[in-house]
């Protein structure tokens, strides 16, 4: 009879512990869900045409873009052992 009481007591304590940890998880989830995050600005929602226009504007403003570097030709060959001086 005492063993049955101990088993039921352990089950009750485990249930209470499980319920309290579930409440903590819900609280953490609600805090994450309600965290103060700034809503995205309207400039972040650019249509596909707007993105292409913005991209071409960036390429024109920055002359070191990939289109410019591809016109320069292949890269120069560099010695694999720069510490050896050529005579």
UniProtKB/Swiss-Prot annotation:
Keywords: Amidation, Neuropeptide, Secreted, Signal
Main location (coarse class): secreted
Annotated positions of the Methionine amide modification: 49
One GO term of the biological process aspect: neuropeptide signaling pathway
Entry keyword annotation includes Oxidoreductase: no
Keyword Signal among UniProt keywords: yes
Subcellular location: Secreted
Feature: compositional bias, Basic residues: 73-87
Region (Disordered): 61-87
Tissue spec. comment: Expressed in the posterior salivary gland and more specifically in the mucus-secreting gland cells.
Transmembrane domains' residue ranges: none
Residues of the propeptide: 23-37, 52-87
A single Gene Ontology CC term: extracellular region
Signal peptide: 1-22
Family statement: Belongs to the tachykinin family.
Annotated function: Tachykinins are active peptides which excite neurons, evoke behavioral responses, are potent vasodilators and secretagogues, and contract (directly or indirectly) many smooth muscles.
Name of the protein described by the UniProt record: Tachykinin-1
Biological source species: Octopus vulgaris (Common octopus)
């Amino acid at each position: 009879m005492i063993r049955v009481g101990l088993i039921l007591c352990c089950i009750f304590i485990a249930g209470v512990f499980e319920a309290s940890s579930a409440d903590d998880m819900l609280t953490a989830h609600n805090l994450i869900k309600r965290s103060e995050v700034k809503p995205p600005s309207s400039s972040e929602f650019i249509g596909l045409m707007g993105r292409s226009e913005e991209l071409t504007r960036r390429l024109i403003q920055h002359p070191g873009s990939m289109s410019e570097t591809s016109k320069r030709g292949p890269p120069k060959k560099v010695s694999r052992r720069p510490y050896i001086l050529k005579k």
